[in-house]
């Protein structure tokens, strides 16, 4: 897909971290970007910075997502690129010892349900709403391409650590969705891929650096090469290549400095 100012994009979770870097990279290439997030102040500030628009969208709500896409399309036209970075999840060991009660307890099923809704279902919701809009749009090139959907999974989907049954399982479900969705949409000229980031210098991880520098140093040392956390702009760079290169379809791409996560 040719990337220029004729293209519109939606980036969920776009107010911070990997979503922010994706929005910045797309906007720098002239793309009209709509930022979906619940962090209104940060989202509005970034939209002003990159010349995009902000839509206060809760990915857990069908109505909120539908309204966000409607607002984005009214401003920029049909989106041809969707980068889904937003996530709602929880953690906890399947069964662990509770010091407060002196007994074992299991992670509540509600946490698994939250992850299923906030990761897998939300990814489907965003992707399917976008695909429905793209299906009615004109083709963009000789490949008859209509759009590109990029989902965000995680290295935890393949190397889930202790306490990541809900998160790793949810991201694993996203992985399993990519190829069948790409096949569902192939006749419409819509591509679907997922990025599996490792440990990146996003706001939560930078918080670890501030409050537990030794732990942060250990995280950096655990990456084979380069021995540091990933830079959000490196994620944004891969997003741009996935948009640009039409032969990327139905793929899970790890972006992790060759790390394989240990149990904890």
Where are these regions (language model features)?
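Canonical Rossmann dinucleotide-binding motif of NAD(H)/NADP(H)-dependent dehydrogenases/reductases
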Residues: 2-33
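Rossmann-fold scaffold of SDR-type NAD(P)-dependent oxidoreductases
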Residues: 12-13, 79-96, 127, 151, ...
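Rossmann-fold cofactor-recognition segment
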Residues: 49-63
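Catalytic loop of short-chain dehydrogenase/reductase
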Residues: 100-118, 123-126, 140-173, 178-187, ...
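Catalytic Tyr-x(3-8)-Lys segment
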Residues: 112, 212-233
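Short, small/polar-rich loop/turn modules that mediate ligand/substrate recognition or access, typified
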Residues: 146, 186, 191, 248-251
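Short, flexible catalytic-loop segment of classical short-chain dehydrogenase/reductase
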Residues: 196-207
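C-terminal substrate-recognition "lid" of short-chain dehydrogenase/reductases
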Residues: 228-255, 260
């Amino acid at each position: 897909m040719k990337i220029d100012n004729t293209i519109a994009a939606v980036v969920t979770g776009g107010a911070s971290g990997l979503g922010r870097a994706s929005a910045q990279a797309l906007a720098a290439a002239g793309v009209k970007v709509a930022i979906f997030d619940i962090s209104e102040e940060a989202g509005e500030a970034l939209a002003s910075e990159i010349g995009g628009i902000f839509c206060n969208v809760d990915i857990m709500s069908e109505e909120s997502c539908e309204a966000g896409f409607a607002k984005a399309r009214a401003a920029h036209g049909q989106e041809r690129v969707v980068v889904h970075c937003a996530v709602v999840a929880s953690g906890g060991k399947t069964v662990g010892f509770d010091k407060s009660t002196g007994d074992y307890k299991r992670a509540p099923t509600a946490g698994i349900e939250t992850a299923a809704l906030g990761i897998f279902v939300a990814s489907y919701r965003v992707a399917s709403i976008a695909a429905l809009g793209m299906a009615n749009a004109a083709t963009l090139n000789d490949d008859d391409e209509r759009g590109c959907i990029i989902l965000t999974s995680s290295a935890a989907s393949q190397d889930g650590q202790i306490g990541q049954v809900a998160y790793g399982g949810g991201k694993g479900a996203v992985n399993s969705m990519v190829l069948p969705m790409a096949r569902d949409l192939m006749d419409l000229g819509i591509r679907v891929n997922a990025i599996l980031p490792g440990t990146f210098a996003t706001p939560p991880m930078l918080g670890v650096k501030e409050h537990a520098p030794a732990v942060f140093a250990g995280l950096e040392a655990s990456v084979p090469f380069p021995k540091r956390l990933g830079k959000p702009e490196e994620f944004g760079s891969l997003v741009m290549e996935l948009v640009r290169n039409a032969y990327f379809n139905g793929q899970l791409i790890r972006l992790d400095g060759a790390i394989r996560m240990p149990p904890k």
